[in-house]
Amino acid sequence: MATSQRKILVTSALPYANGPIHLGHMLEYIQTDIWSRYQKLRGHECHYICADDAHGTPIMLKAQQLGMAPEEMIAQVNKEHQQDFADFNIAFDNYHSTHSEENRVLASDIYLKLRANGYIKSKSISQLFDPEKSMFLPDRFVKGTCPKCKSPDQYGDNCDACGATYSPTELINPKSAVSGATPVMKDTEHFFFDLPAFEDMLKEWTRSGALQTEMANKLDEWFEQGLQQWDITRDAPYFGFEIPDAPGKYFYVWLDAPIGYMGSFKNLCDKHPELSFDEFWAKDSKAEVYHFIGKDIVYFHSLFWPAMLHGSGYRQPNSVYAHGYVTVNGAKMSKSKGTFIKARTYLDHLDPEYLRYYYAAKLSSRIDDLDLNLEDFVQRVNSDLVGKLVNLASRTAGFITKRFDGKLAKIADTTLTDAFLAKQEQIAEFYETREYGKAMREIMALADIANGFVADAAPWQLVKQDDQQETAHQVCSNALNLFRILVTYLKPVLPRLALDVEAFFQQTLTWDALNQDMAGHEIAPFKAMMQRVELEKVNAMVADSKENLQATSEPEAPKGPLATDPISDTINFEDFAKIDLRIARIVKAEHVAEADKLLKLQLDIGGETRQVFAGIKSAYSPEDLEGKLTVMVANLAPRKMRFGMSEGMVLAAGPGGSDLWILEPHEGAQPGMRVK
């Protein structure tokens, strides 16, 4: 056991209950599962809990489209999610749903405490209302013409074409995305959480070490912009929890979603009376609470969530750890390319241990995006897991079984064993600090040493010589003991392989048993533990992931982009000459808080720096853009936006969403050059 046992509660973000798990999701659950398994391997009391995020307008509408009750749909999705996670060897101690009695009670409790403490405000607001569906329309459920650039079919909060942000009421010719009806304005009373009241507490907490440096720096920007009152209300019809004392008013999904962590743990406590909910969540709790999340939901977890907990008398998490996005072959996951891969599709073709190892080998404590390069995936799995790790046992175990009664010899020279054991604290530190890539490199470096030892000793030659039998016994026993140590180090990453190795050694692999003397220990006959991954299987997985495109029944219809976006009316040369296009280098790119589609760009145009807000967040992460050359409209009148002044426009092509590409000039171009 560990010298000082810790009490730990760890969570992953709750997957939304309106669709399947994909490999982008799996990064987080694998990352968290490795950390949880490591804590348990060290003898700590660690509870890994999660749940489906099961409320909101999207779920209500999708259930209607499927002709199902929302409760029926989320139950079905929950079952599918749990099966996917189980097959990826994600070892939750409890998996629940935010649509639960535990969560309803806790959400109401927290709200009522916030209200009693003066942190809930009420005011009347005007919102767009769908007269056909008799429902208020959230931002994303209204579409119309952008009030800034006049582009049609834009959402109610942000324009894909020009990057402008606005309120739904500013749209030209707005239409309900639910029914197509023209919405009307209607007043409604909403409740707001007084987030600005917690600014001092949040500034202290975010700089306490609870967040990664990159996250804390981003929060400083949000503090500079000023915290806003947070609307926690949605009007009926809505699938969620009704707000106490407010008939027809429901909690916004982001209020009860993080409370789902508490609800799932309460459900676990009810199953295990020896567990105390208050021991982990009371204000004076000495237990540890950690949240693993994606970088896209930092705002909710590092501002709203700790403020809600503090204002209602609960403890704050020790840390919130964010990770980046998953790209495939250097690009955003794409359905048409077959790189938007569902967890189930992967499982139909490949061993989950492969992906667990590959993600671990590339994960760090930073918020960098992780690229799943499929060719590198094949090479790394085959080289590290099959060629180095399992091969160490496969080429030595047979000699022990056939020639030495299956029993290991006492190692006379422990130099290698001592060197392997000397790495345990460094590897432990890497696991603890989520530097999994560094841990994998240390472990594989040891595997190289072990394989070199076997290759140099050549036991297959020694067993042929009568006077070298004891040496052969020593070499093979030493190799297998090194293999045991390596797999123990890898047990959090490769749990199924660890089970196979435990069956082979006929004992449980534990951290405390790393230095166990294995002399005289009997092993079971060796069985194949891991197969090489073939590129053909990977290609078959990609083929199965490709979106089925419907063939058109009108062969003469226009094809390509012109089919949906015809060429505009002819203009005179004088009109074009008014536009000053310049080469610009993207010096810095940043996310914009509370903007779903915007990135803030700092552009060098040759002796002058411009700030531009661009609606390209769906296609690019900031780090992908920095250093690139692009083309900007340099003489566009500056436009004051909610987030600052935009001093131009960058050019991009594509229909939108993930299929959007900024223009990149030839490398010979220089910032400031005119495009003619």
Swiss-Prot record:
Residues the record lists as binding Zn(2+) = 146, 149, 159, 162
> By its UniProt entry, which InterPro entries does this protein fall under?
aa-tRNA-synth_I_CS, Anticodon_Met, Met-tRNA-synth_bsu_C, Met-tRNA_ligase_1, Met-tRNA_synth, Methionyl/Leucyl_tRNA_Synth, MetRS_core, MetRS_Zn
Keyword Transcription regulation listed? The answer is no
Tell me the compartments it is located in. Answer: Cytoplasm
Binding-site residues, ATP: 335
One Gene Ontology molecular-function label: methionine-tRNA ligase activity
Q: Name the Enzyme Commission number(s) assigned to this protein.
A: 6.1.1.10
Q: What is a biological process (GO) this protein takes part in?
A: methionyl-tRNA aminoacylation
| Chain's role | Is required not only for elongation of protein synthesis but also for the initiation of all mRNA translation through initiator tRNA(fMet) aminoacylation.
HAMAP family, per the entry: Met_tRNA_synth_type1 (MF_00098)
Descriptive protein name:
Methionine--tRNA ligase
Q: Which organism is it from?
A: Shewanella sp. (strain ANA-3)
Recorded name of the encoding gene: metG
